[in-house]
């Protein structure tokens, strides 16, 4: 295991060369003390090269799938807090300190961010709303974007072995 700063920004990527540099730069600005990791999941473009040039620590994950990549990240990286974000530029890095603050102040295990501007087609928006409604009805949690790839979690010793991380809905 590698010891890092207290916050590790984890960015699983597949063919994100168009957005990865701005995502990395956004986190360098909003969380300057964090360590930024990009795990390239068999990209056929220049994602890994551009991420390294932007200053991220880049690693390869040859086993296809976001869940596999997340498990590898949790197994490889040690930090007090993990911030997970997609490399596609969907989320606002400037909001990261607010997610971390909420996690610490409320002493909770995970905070889920949301997409401010849902850049999906109408079917995706409707599906997301339906799943959010169902989740609220079943579990009582007030999620606005259950499928968000923007999350901050407190480090947990079982995270790398968790079967829940082997499957992630998008």
Predicted regions and their residues:
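A conserved acidic beta->alpha catalytic loop
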Residues: 40-48, 89
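Conserved donor nucleotide-binding strand/loop of the catalytic core
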Residues: 35-37, 48-76
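Short beta-strand/loop segment that forms part of the nucleotide-sugar
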Residues: 11, 24, 33-42, 59
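Short, well-formed alpha-helical segments that are part of the catalytic scaffolds
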Residues: 15-29
